[in-house]
């Protein structure tokens, strides 16, 4: 009886594992589930895109006298990134099966690069605030931001071009590792400047409601963005070596749902909610046009 009792947990675990595996395979192979999940992602991205557009319009109506500020560009890029993702998942059948394969890579990777550019814009903004508060030079920060983004896009274009001419598994592996490295750089940027600005605000001698709000804003956005980019880095790196975890394929709808909800949809929605406050109508030191 004792031996039987000891075997029961293992047997139950085995049965549960088999049932979950069977369900996972059934869902992945079901056209109905595939369509349902990808259309759900389409709807989620469309909703976030609409929220970003509404917020952009509200900001423009609030301060129409200013040009393209960092805040406006950030919301515009969120609108574009999430809108493009919504279209891609809305036409998932055509996108995942498009030929040549390099074109499929372009369609699926480009929104991820735009997501990187949009959110590292926050890193740039915080870096400028931190440097100004420390009386450090800020003239090279935007040059660095632009240079890093240009380098990332040029490298990615090179990978796409090579895949177009010589499609092989080695180049695909390099492409995935490159995306993982780019995601790690973004996570590091948030940890570095988000963390610095957070601790600088904590040491600020004057206690005020505005300081507490800004502290909560910086801390929350830093934690969210660092986590989502780090998860993207790990998942993409692992998927490069494990075909069972391959993303952006029709027969892995559940994996795609979990991945994109965790690394893009939920972080975007949370950040837009946290940064929902409209800028003041009068000129502020924290709200200035992009030069």
Curated annotation (Swiss-Prot):
Plastid in keyword set: no
Main location class: membrane
Q: Which InterPro entries match?
A: THH1/TOM1/TOM3, THH1/TOM1/TOM3_dom
Q: Where are the bilayer-spanning segments? A: 4-24, 37-57, 79-99, 105-125, 145-165, 173-193, 221-241, 254-274
- Protein name stated in the entry: Tobamovirus multiplication protein 1
Q: What happens when the gene is disrupted?
A: Reduced efficiency of intracellular multiplication of tobamoviruses (e.g. crucifer strain TMV-Cg), characterized by a reduced accumulation of viral coat protein (CP) and reduced amplification of TMV-related RNAs.
Q: Which segments does the topology annotation call Extracellular?
A: 25-36, 100-104, 166-172, 242-253
Q: Which keywords fit this entry according to its UniProt record?
A: Glycoprotein, Host-virus interaction, Membrane, Transmembrane, Transmembrane helix, Vacuole
Its annotated function is as follows: Necessary for the efficient intracellular multiplication of tobamoviruses, probably being a membrane anchor promoting the formation of the replication complex.
Q: What lineage, starting at the top, does this entry show?
A: Eukaryota, Viridiplantae, Streptophyta, Embryophyta, Tracheophyta
Please state the gene responsible for encoding this protein.
TOM1
Subcellular localization: Vacuole membrane
Q: Which family does it belong to?
A: Belongs to the plant tobamovirus multiplication TOM1 protein family.
Instruction: Please give the subunit comment from the record.
Output: Constituent of tobamovirus replication complex. Interacts with TOM2A and with the helicase domain of tobamovirus-encoded replication proteins.
Q: Which organism is it from?
A: Arabidopsis thaliana
């Amino acid at each position: 009886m004792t031996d039987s009792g000891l075997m029961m947990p293992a047997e139950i675990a085995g049965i549960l594992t088999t049932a979950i595996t069977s369900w996972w395979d059934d869902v992945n192979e079901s056209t109905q589930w595939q369509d349902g999940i990808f259309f759900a992602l389409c709807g989620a991205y469309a909703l976030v895109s609409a929220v970003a557009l509404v917020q952009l319009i509200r900001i423009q109506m609030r301060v129409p006298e200013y040009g393209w500020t960092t805040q406006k560009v950030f919301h515009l890029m969120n609108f574009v990134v999430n809108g493009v993702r919504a279209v891609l998942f809305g036409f998932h059948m055509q996108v995942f099966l498009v030929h040549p394969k390099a074109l499929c890579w372009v369609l699926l990777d480009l929104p991820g690069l735009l997501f990187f550019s949009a959110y590292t814009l926050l890193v740039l903004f915080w870096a400028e605030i931190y440097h100004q508060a420390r009386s450090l030079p800020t003239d090279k920060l935007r040059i660095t931001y632009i240079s890093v983004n240009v380098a990332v896009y040029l490298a990615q274009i090179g990978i796409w071009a090579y895949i177009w001419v010589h499609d092989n598994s080695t180049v695909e592996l390099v492409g995935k590792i490159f995306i993982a490295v780019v995601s790690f750089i973004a996570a590091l940027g948030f940890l570095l400047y988000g963390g610095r600005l957070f601790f600088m605000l904590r040491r600020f001698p004057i206690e005020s409601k505005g300081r507490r709000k800004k502290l909560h804003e910086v801390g929350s956005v830093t934690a969210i963005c660092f986590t989502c980019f780090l998860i993207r880095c790990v998942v993409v790196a692992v998927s490069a070596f494990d075909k069972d975890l391959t993303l952006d394929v029709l027969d892995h709808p559940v994996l795609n749902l979990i991945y994109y909800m965790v690394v893009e949809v939920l972080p975007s929605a949370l950040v837009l909610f946290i940064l929902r406050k409209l800028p003041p109508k009068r000129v502020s030191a924290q709200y200035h046009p992009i030069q």
